[in-house]
């Protein structure tokens, strides 16, 4: 698995237990067993990694979503599946990233 994705998965898992603002690059890299320089080779900071997570979230079902109701159901199911991660993001300085992700999912549906 690529280092970026290992770091992303570790961050998502950690955010289910610890607030994002309490997670340091050092703690994250120790969990992934990579050094800090490796993290900074790929990312500027934790929020840069968080951006990658939201940009790369798999949403294959979205291509099949045809209306607003289906979009809302999709968002709800996504939230249930990723509750710890989403709640931690919404209660942190990364709140705007989660809001933008939800906005983009809705926007793509409304353009159809």
Where are these regions (language model features)?
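Phosphate-binding site recognition
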Residues: 25, 36, 60, 80-83, ...
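Append "Primarily bacterial transcriptional regulators
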Residues: 7, 26-31, 39, 79
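Amphipathic alpha-helical linker/stalk segments
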Residues: 16, 23, 53-75, 86-87
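A short secondary-structure junction motif
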Residues: 53-57, 82, 86, 105-112
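HTH DNA-binding helix-turn interface
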Residues: 16-20, 33-50
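DNA major-groove recognition helix of helix-turn-helix
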Residues: 7, 11, 43, 50, ...
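Basic, helix-initiating cap at the start of DNA-binding domains
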Residues: 1-18, 27
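Amphipathic alpha-helical packing segments from all-alpha helical-bundle domains
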Residues: 70, 74-77, 95-112
């Amino acid at each position: 698995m690529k280092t970026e994705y290992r770091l992303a998965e570790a961050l998502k898992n950690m955010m289910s237990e610890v607030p994002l603002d309490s997670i340091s690059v050092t703690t994250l890299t120790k969990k992934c067993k990579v050094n800090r320089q490796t993290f900074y080779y790929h990312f500027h900071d934790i929020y840069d990694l968080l951006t990658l997570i939201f940009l790369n979230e798999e949403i294959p079902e979205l291509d099949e979503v045809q209306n607003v109701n289906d979009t809302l159901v999709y968002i709800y199911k996504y939230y249930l599946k990723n509750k710890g991660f989403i709640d931690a993001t919404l209660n942190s300085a990364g709140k705007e990233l989660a809001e933008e992700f939800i906005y983009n999912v809705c926007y793509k549906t409304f353009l159809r």
